């Protein structure tokens, strides 16, 4: 019985952690400039200066946006000499994907059930 409660508690904590990660990522994605930066990073890793010239804002502003994206787990930085190069961190999008799927799974099942009933 204690083991069962422990497992349930662990699953609850994992769900809460995943939801917190999804919330952090969604909050970071709530700023259009950050979405634009992520779109640019889809083509490959880039330095802050490169990104700043492409989004037409200061390097300082891009650095602040990248810091938010990094804290949310959506990008990762790598030192390349004196520069930091940023890349999309695909794994950071998993909690968002799980969150969105949680809305679709019941609806898709209901649709499947309706289709099977009508046969």
Language model features: what each stretch is:
Residues 25, 66, 82-84, 97-102:
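Short, structured secondary-structure boundary patches
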Residues 1-21, 39, 93-119:
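Amphipathic alpha-helical dimerization/coiled-coil segments
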Residues 53, 64, 70-71:
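Alpha-helical residues within the helix-turn-helix
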Residues 70-81, 87:
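Beta-hairpin "wing" of winged helix-turn-helix
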Residues 16, 20-61, 83-94:
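N-terminal helix-turn-helix DNA-binding core of bacterial DNA-binding proteins
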Residues 45, 55, 66, 97, ...:
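Short amphipathic alpha-helical/adjacent loop interface patches that line ligand
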